[in-house]
Amino acid sequence: MLPTILSISYEHTYAYLSKYQTAYACEGKKLTIECEPGDVINLIRANYGRFSITICNDHGNVEWSVNCMFPKSLSVLNSRCAHKQSCGVLAATSMFGDPCPGTHKYLEAHYQCISAAQTSTTTNRPSPPPWVLSNGPPIFGNGSGLIHPPGVGAGAPPPPRLPTLPGVVGISGNPGLFNVPPQHTAVTHSTPSSSTTAVGGGRLKGVPTSTTTTKHPAGRHDGLPPPPQLHHHHNHHGDDTATPTKPSSKLPAGGNATSPSNTRILTGVGGSGTDDGTLLTTKSSPNRPPGTAASGAVVPGNGSVVRTINNINLNAAGISGGDDESKLFCGPTHARNLYWNMTRVGDVNVQPCPGGAAGIAKWRCVLMKRMPDSGYDEYDDDPSSTTPAPNGGDCLHNSSSCEPPVSMAHKVNQRLRNFEPTWHPATPDLTQCRSLWLNNLEMRVNQRDSSLISIANDMSEVTSSKTLYGGDMLVTTKIIQTVSEKMLHDKETFPDQRQREAMIMELLHCVVKTGSNLLDESQLSSWLDLNPEDQMRVATSLLTGLEYNAFLLADTIIRERSVVQKVKNILLSVRVLETKTIQSSVVFPDSDQWPLSSDRIELPRAALIDNSEGGLVRIVFAAFDRLESILKPSYDHFDLKSSRSYVRNTAILSNDSDVNAGEIQQRLRILNSKVISASLGKGRHIQLSQPITLTLKHLKTENVTNPTCVFWNYIDHAWSANGCSLESTNRTHSVCSCNHLTNFAILMDVVDEHQHSLFTMFDGNMRIFIYISIGICVVFIVIALLTLKLFNGVFVKSARTSIYTSIYLCLLAIELLFLLGIEQTETSIFCGFITIFLHCAILSGTAWFCYEAFHSYSTLTSDELLLEVDQTPKVNCYYLLSYGLSLSVVAISLVIDPSTYTQNDYCVLMEANALFYATFVIPVLVFFVAAIGYTFLSWIILCRKSRTGLKTKEHTRLASVRFDIRCSFVFLLLLSAVWCSSYFYLRGAKMDDDTADVYGYCFICFNTLLGLYIFVFHCIQNEKIRREYRKYVRQHAWLPKCLRCSKTSISSGIVTGNGPTAGTLCSVSTSKKPKLPLGVSEEAHDDPQQQQHTPVPITEDAIMGASSDCELNEAQQRRTLKSGLMTGTLQAPPQTLGGHVVLERGSTLRSTGHASPTSSAGSTHLIFAHKQQQQQQQQQQGPLGEGYYHQPDYYSWKQPPTGTGGLKTPREYYNNTGASASSPQQAHEVFYWTQKPNSGQHGKKKRGAGGVPASPSGSLHSRTAAASQVLFYPSYKKTKAGQPTGYPQYAEALDPPLATGNAAAYYQQQQQLRRQQLHQQQQQQLSSDEEQVEQHAHLLHLQRRAGSQQQLPAPPPHMAQYQHEFMQRQYRNKHSNCDLGMGDAYYNQGSVGGADGGPVYEEILSNRNSDVQHYEVGDFDVDEVYNNSVGTGVFNNMRAAVAAGGSRYGGGSLSGGSVSSRSQQQQLKKQQQQQSLAQQRSARRCTADDDDDEEEEEDEEATAAEQLHDSVCDEDEEEDESDLEDDAHGLPPQSDERMRRLMAMQDEDFKRRFQRQLRKHGAPLDYGALPPGSGPQPEHNGAVFGVSGGVGEGSMRGAFRQQQALNAKSPGGRLAVNDLFGHGNSGPPLPPANQTPAQKRQQLQKLSPQSTTSSSSHTSHSNPNPHPLQLTHPHPHQHPPHHQQRHLSAMLDENNTVRCYLEPLAK
């Protein structure tokens, strides 16, 4: 029966760690070993002696030997304790003998408690690797990067000392050492045999108790650490030893009993190189006769030799010799002046030492793994090449199932292709080579009468001039110690103190010089001739020899003195100080003594005084150069960071996959500072009362990390950190603190220089893709954040907006931190910080996703479904929970183990430990599960609500919530895919997993999709955001024309034409199915035939895609049409004049909504209409200026078109009573506002503008506004078909001859008051309400950016003297920007009304976030009430004149109006004359060209125009003075005051401008008494103005303020909402946004025409410097008829906007 085969791996090693135990008993005590019932003792190894100075040493004696052992210790213990449950052995020399007299010894036993049943079934019990059973090795072992030459003591004379066990004969009779030499032996388990002998060459020839000797030098490049030493003070001669296995009591009857070899690829560092290598190991059979070789060659015998290389069974591979085996040889080479012939793998080549040196040199041939770029694939198996297996084959020892041997042979051959024979180590082993000169010095120093000074001088000369070998280093340090010992006795022979000091000082100089020679670079090859352990021993001997000689001098000096010995590589200072002179700390070295390094050591005063003797303190300092290259740290400590290298190098075949992927591996450490030494008194390990401080400079600053303060332990021959701590560190220096004295240095970890960052493992393509993916995602996240920031007026400030803003911020931080982290290395100072912040950002991001899902759930389960408003307390709670919890978790993680953020390979992952799962994985999973749970709950509620009967608005809101939930769920899944793929990719790449690339490309794809998803579903799909994008593109001239002229960038159309080319659009427009036939020629009023042409059809895309800011292919005047879906046909009437586009509509009009002047960017007046009939708009060519163009719904919705195309006079229009009978009543009305260019500014600075340039938006207040602008402001009212009620108050607004003078006089009266207040209001006021409006109002520009052949329009008559400024404004207008309309999808398209006759409601949508602002009433001017009052008197006077002389106005009467007396008309004439004179005087103050202006005023119309211009000029100068006086009358700010004021402001501004326009033209219009259902439309010019035109910005604010001042005594001073839309008779019954407030109407009703007129006349006559009229005490004289009040109901809709429903008019 074959014995049980056990493969030992690291995984099994951890199992052993839990079972193996160690017991100690000091000399004279009893060692007791006891196991649990049912278990028996299985001894592993034992020793009676001493290997450690710390065990059983209560008094700290350092003179005892630490190389003491009794070889038969294990045999004695086995006889007493083997296979027993408990036993006891007395640790005494009577039992074990006395291996080292004078040393206090102890008994040490390593054992294992095994089940008693195992002893009867197991034939072979393999022992674990000895390094697993290490008895607490020092923190850094003896080894170094330098190699231990293989074969030293193993095959070359002098023969090694092998353990002498029962049946084992030591080589050459030398008693062998039992212990395993540190880092140089590995255990090979085999079947027991009877004897072990050694053959020539040092190779072991084994039978039954076979031992395998392998070397594990330090410094492997594959990272596998050599086994740490069991003891640290033994085998100072570098002899190799073997550990025998325990013989078994039962053996199989026959057959080949083989056990696997545990030999790994051996590594070593020869010089500066690192190599992998293996030794050939043997496995013997029980029947193998003694004397057979075990070196790897097949030795004849009764048994077979199982030869393995790197655990590769060469027998199974079919490699038995011949050509296949002949390839496993190292080629010949030259090294160290010797020729090394071809050597078989596993053999040691031995030669005599070169250059006449005594001894032998050795070099071993091993099998090394090829570099990765060798082109061979380690696992490149070809399953197709199989052949039958002879004799059934064998099974690999660590395979779970047997495979055919031929297939195994193929795998072995493939495996061996990755290895090549190599000499190991890099240089031969010349430890036994000694030169003749040093041999001679060694003989002389041992002679009694030799001169120590002469020997020291000769030694310094030899070491500086002769070539030394490895053995010479050992001899030299031994001579140094011998010289110091002899000088200690010889100095007493010199009676003179000075002579003694001189002799010892000379000896010290020679010794220091010799030590410097040994450290010189020329002797580096001599150090490399030594194995690592010998290097450590030689270095320790050198340090102690120098210290002994230095203290020899210090003890000789009896007074305060300082001696400095400075040579090339050593600075030594001996200081003898008197305690009374020590005032502060002692510092070494001085700044000028040692320029090679900036290291510094500081001894505190208290520590020095405590160690004084006889009032003197003796200190020895030393600084060394190049010693750091000798005292290299060993690698007996492990970490989990580079386990992949172990897995790659250990897994030989596919069935090696059971090797744990997390196996431990070495961490490369270097000595990264010079060695500096300080010794105090006679003891080297004196505990100081106060710690010393060391400042050490780093030799290497790149790719190093984790500094550790260490000292050199003379006893352990290793670096240790006991008693030292790191105080601070930076890139170049570290500060340490130690409580004892010895040799100090800094150890640091080395980051693999070939893998500087995470990207080093990426191939070129993947690295580029990762950059692109992260860049795309970052760009889209930034766009989303800027969208939320720049277009915040579009969004409702709600919890969902805040949540998504936080999510975007977290994702942006994650992307940026990941991008930074993958470029950092472990040594970077930012590495740990990046990992910490990335941890926090991921936790915060997942928390926000959870809160977003919870918010959707709470919205559906509460009253928030119909009202999405700001929820500040809830959002603050989200902030606290997300960021607070994340920071708390990270803080706890930092407190528990800060190294978890710095111990990983890359700076984007935490160390995969329990803390990682507790603080990262579990919180993330909790948040994700909670988010998914709330999402499913929300979906269930949505399904339930969808099946119940809800209102229309609830269904709309549910649809919005349903869309949000879907997007959030997809967003969450996509983000999970991104993070999971990135995690698995990093882990896979770290372990060199083949699937890592798959995860990597998945991460690239998912991350890119994440960015696109954020942009598309969170930005593009939102109609509001799309509209704002278009607006932003339009309003910024720095953007390229291709964007601003694209068909998707604006929703306004531009149609131009001249004759047959009418309707030509921008070249960027594309043609689709024509829907909007439109076309009007500029010269239509001149050519009646041309007016009859068929309109040129234009397309929907033309309307949507044209831009007023684009260069067009024609130079004619443009016509604008607000975009909208209009069904039916649009015909151009033959009477169209000016710059307007007239549409005759049929069927239904569906408007996308046009921006109200009182609304924000997201506000509109919705249009609902059905079965609208054709309508006409008639315009009359007039001078460029203000004009009021009112669609004639207030008077007559249907103006019957004339067959001839002529225009009816205004008188005919208002006197026509039969129009309504012949044409149906149209259901709605439309208002168009016009703006006059800023012709009267003369460069004056407007209030609120400051030094800021004019707005480029081309809005109402822009200085670069167009000469003609159209503001589409639709507002519709339901009126009954037939004869609408008359509106007689319109007659008083249309009397130009009477109104012109009054207006001019009014502005003259206000001029002085405003000038007095101008200096108090400069730069102190905010933007006026009109300037607030300009940010929201929508304008479509005319006459903008014409072609090169287009002629600029001629300036109006009153602008003739300002030709230059007019041209400049036209030029600026050409380069101004486009404005934006509304998108079609944003507005509701249905009608809440019904058919004709049914109630139709108006809806006014006002974005509360923009409209609701706080303003004082003081923002409005006072002066306008007077103007309105005068206007009312003028209206009444005009009605009286019409009644008296009806023939002038075409006959008829005014219905519903009052008739004024003839005396009132006379007063108005006088008032007009005075105003004309005053206006001429004020005109001189406005311009420097007044004299020329007076000569040009030849007729009344020109005078009126000039007067209007002068008043405008004065108004611009004085508008800043209008607010200060009335600030005291302001009302407290109200939440809805902004919207109300703007509504009232629009009404006042319209009336004022309407009156001013009529005065300027001076042409009377006959309103008549006919119903407004018939008659032509009023005449007007082609220019259009908006809410606040260019004539006088802010001039309409005073009326509202005055009215508020008059009503300040009313309770609260608020405006009633219902009064906003009441129909009064103080002005035109405008749409809801233009209604006069009830409070103001009541005040105006108190002003009679007589009082108003007389007040105006009195002021004009009596006061040459007019002052404001006193309107606070009006005298009511006549009350106009009161019209119907319309009540308003308001609510907040789902978009957080105010939705007003106006009561329908009476039928």
UniProtKB/Swiss-Prot annotation:
Residues 25-114 form the SUEL-type lectin domain. Gene3D superfamilies: 1.25.40.610, 2.60.120.740, 2.60.220.50, GPCR, family 2, extracellular hormone receptor domain (4.10.1240.10), Rhodopsin 7-helix transmembrane proteins (1.20.1070.10). Residues 176-301, 376-400, 1169-1188, 1236-1260, 1316-1335, 1450-1538, 1563-1582, 1612-1687 are annotated as: Disordered. GO terms for molecular function: carbohydrate binding; G protein-coupled receptor activity; mechanoreceptor activity. It is a multi-pass membrane protein. Belongs to the G-protein coupled receptor 2 family. LN-TM7 subfamily. This is Latrophilin Cirl. Proteolytically cleaved into 2 subunits, an extracellular subunit and a seven-transmembrane subunit.
